[in-house]
C-alpha cells in the first residue's frame, strides 16, 4: 500500500463535511492509496508548511500532497509571501526525499478571489511544473461561472457531490504518480 500525507486547509479537510467525506477519502475508494488527511480549516500556507516541517511522518510515507492559498488570499497575504511558503515546502521535500504533489487552487465562484487564485495558479505552474507533480482538478468542479456557482456551498467550499467528483477525478492521476 502507498501512503500520501495530505496537507492543506479546509479544502483538504473536507469542510463542512469532515475528513471522512473529503475528496481525499474518495481517492482511497478508487485506489490502493491511504490518504493521510492533515487538512486544518482556516490555515494559511505558512501555517501548513510549519506543520509539514515540524511533525515527523512515518518512515513509510514517501509522498506529500499540498493544497493551500485560498485563506492567504482572503487574509490579504501577497503572492510573493505565498510563493515563498511553497518554495520552503519544495526545499523541505527535496531535503527529505519526499515526492511532492501540488494541487492547483480551486477556482471559486467569487470573481475578486479568482483574480488572485489565477495569479497563484499561474505562478505555481511557472515555478514548479518541472519540479513537482501539479494536479489541476478544476474539470471536476466546473470551468464556467455557472458551473462554479452550482458547485460550491459558499463560493469556496465544494458541495458533497463535488468533493466526490474531485476524488474520482484525482484518483487515477494520484495512483499513477505514486507508482512512478
List where the protein language model places each region.
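Oxyanion-hole/transition-state-stabilizing segment in secreted/luminal serine hydrolases
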Residues: 17-20, 46-84, 102, 108
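Helix C-cap/helix->beta junction micro-motif
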Residues: 31, 96-97, 128-131
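Glycine-rich phosphate-binding loop signature in dinucleotide/nucleotide-binding domains
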Residues: 57-61, 96, 177
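Serine-esterase "nucleophile elbow" of acetyl-processing enzymes
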Residues: 1-41, 46, 52-60
Amino acid at each position: 500500500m502507498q501512503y500520501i500525507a495530505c496537507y492543506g486547509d479546509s479544502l483538504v479537510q473536507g469542510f463542512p463535511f469532515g475528513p471522512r467525506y473529503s475528496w481525499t477519502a474518495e481517492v482511497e475508494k478508487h485506489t490502493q492509496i491511504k490518504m493521510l488527511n492533515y487538512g486544518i480549516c482556516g490555515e494559511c500556507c505558512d501555517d501548513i508548511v510549519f506543520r509539514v516541517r515540524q511533525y515527523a511522518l512515518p518512515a513509510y510515507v514517501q509522498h506529500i500532497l499540498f493544497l493551500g492559498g485560498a485563506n492567504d488570499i482572503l487574509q490579504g497575504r501577497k503572492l510573493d509571501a505565498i510563493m515563498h511558503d511553497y518554495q520552503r515546502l519544495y526545499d523541505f521535500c527535496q531535503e527529505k526525499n519526499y515526492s511532492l504533489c501540488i494541487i492547483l487552487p480551486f477556482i471559486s465562484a467569487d470573481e475578486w478571489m479568482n483574480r488572485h487564485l489565477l495569479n497563484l495558479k499561474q505562478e505555481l505552474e511557472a515555478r514548479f511544473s518541472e519540479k513537482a507533480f501539479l494536479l489541476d482538478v478544476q474539470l471536476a468542479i466546473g470551468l464556467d461561472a455557472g458551473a462554479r456557482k452550482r458547485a460550491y456551498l459558499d463560493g469556496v467550499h465544494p458541495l458533497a457531490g463535488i468533493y466526490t467528483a474531485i476524488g474520482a477525478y484525482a484518483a487515477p492521476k494520484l495512483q499513477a504518480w505514486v507508482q512512478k
